[in-house]
Every structure is written in C-alpha cells, then in structure tokens.
C-alpha cells in the first residue's frame, strides 16, 4: 500500500507539472499581420450576411463553376452552402498558390528518429500529381474509395490530396491498427486500393505496415491494388 501511495504521489506531481505551461511561442509577423479580421468585415456581415459570404467565397476560393445560390436553408438543420458550385480541394490547396508562392514552404515535417523535410507548394504539387496519375492508371475513378494506412509521414498528406484531385474518397486508417482492424475498415468502405508503406516509426519501434496489409488482404475481397511507399 505504501509503495502504491508513493507512486500515486509521483504521478499526481507529474500530472500537475504537465498542467503548468510557461513556454511561449510567438507568431510570426506575417501571421500577426494577416490573422485579424478588420472591423469592416463585421459591419458588412451584419448588414447582409449572405452577400458577405458570397463575396468571401468568390474571392478566396478558386471555382471551376462559380455558385449562383449562396445558401439553401429549405431543409433545416441540413443547410447547404454554394450547392451548385464546383471546385476541387486539391486545386485550392496547391495549384492556386504555385504562381506566387510555389517556392514557399507548405509545411514542415519532423519524424522519427529525427529526419526532417521542408516541403514547398511546388514540391507537394509534383508529388500529388505523380500519385494521382498513378491512381488513375490503376483504374481509380471518382467515387472510388482508397484506404490510406501510413505512418505520420509526408506521404499521408500527398495521398489525401491525390485522392481529392481525382475525386476519390480517402479513408485514413490509424497506422497502429492490426490486420483485422484494417480489414474491417477496408470492408466498411469497400476500398479497392490501399496506400501503405513497408514500415513506419512509432515510439522508437518500426511498425510493419506492409505485413499488416498482407494479413488484411486475406480478410477482404475488395482490394485490387496496393501502393507501397519504401
């Protein structure tokens, strides 16, 4: 009992220490300059909220077909915004930034055991296009489901954007799940393609992702192709 008590005291002290956070992470000047919404926006939105959001949507999003209807509130609480517009998420995340910000870093990645990457919009665009073209060559079409079973690597971002680019539906499966759990999710989604890796670092160990996928294939009949990151 005494040992448990001491351990409990230690754990309580550790929890309290974690609750006290004194570090500061100041935002960049660029972020500060662009973070706050001007007061004129509030005035504009209060006068005509639908017109305000129409303006924001048309100026801040790239459309293949601009919407003519702002809000469909005919079936509350199932509201639909810009329902007759057409766009592509991957295009808005990547293509629209290339001309002015192609060399700008889209995101920083740090993995185990300490490797890092700085991925620009141009780099990400090229990777996404390469994978989306590969998916199309494998017969993946709009509406098809793709299971993504990866570690926390840049390829998981590439995979999601590549699916969005061709209209495929991606289903991200946690890389720590077993073959059985992965198979359950493949079957639920009826995924015809799986994107995985030969392995992934997690808490100092390498998770055998590809081996887990191989095990899941024995429990599903939907998968036609497996793409492996090495």
Predicted features along the sequence, with ranges:
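Short, Lys/Arg-enriched N-terminal segments with co-localized hydrophobic residues
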Residues: 1-10
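N-terminal amphipathic, basic-rich helices that act as targeting or association modules
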Residues: 11-81
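A short N-terminal helical cap/helix-turn-helix that marks the beginning
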Residues: 46-65, 85-107
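Conserved AMP-binding/adenylate-forming core of the ANL superfamily
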Residues: 90, 107-161, 178-183
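Glycine-rich phosphate/diphosphate-binding loops that line cofactor/substrate pockets in enzymes
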Residues: 98-100, 135-140, 184-192
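Structural core segment of the AMP-binding/adenylate-forming
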Residues: 165-230
